[in-house]
């Protein structure tokens, strides 16, 4: 049975879900930063998904990346599945701009995470839910 890793649960807020993945927003206001987590138990690598799920993951990742770049006018989309700290398969999608605090370096460890201001987190969640509104997206 699929259960979200407690570290992802603590560091993120749920935006909603697509047919395969839960969509999470990282609680770091420095960047538009989403994480896709395939809703499959005991999976830490993409190759451990069956072929249909691998194809669905690529579709969902591309869908999320394209919508994020359009919404936030990014210069570069950083996508990565590291898993060194949290082994549960999760794929980071970070919109990067030439003016963000870490540019051009990777976001991890570059600057301290910045909490969302009061009310801003809820606004961002609503904004993203609207961005992903489709027949297959289910808001959290």
Give the predicted meaning of each segment.
Residues 1-89, 93-140:
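HIT superfamily nucleotide-processing domains
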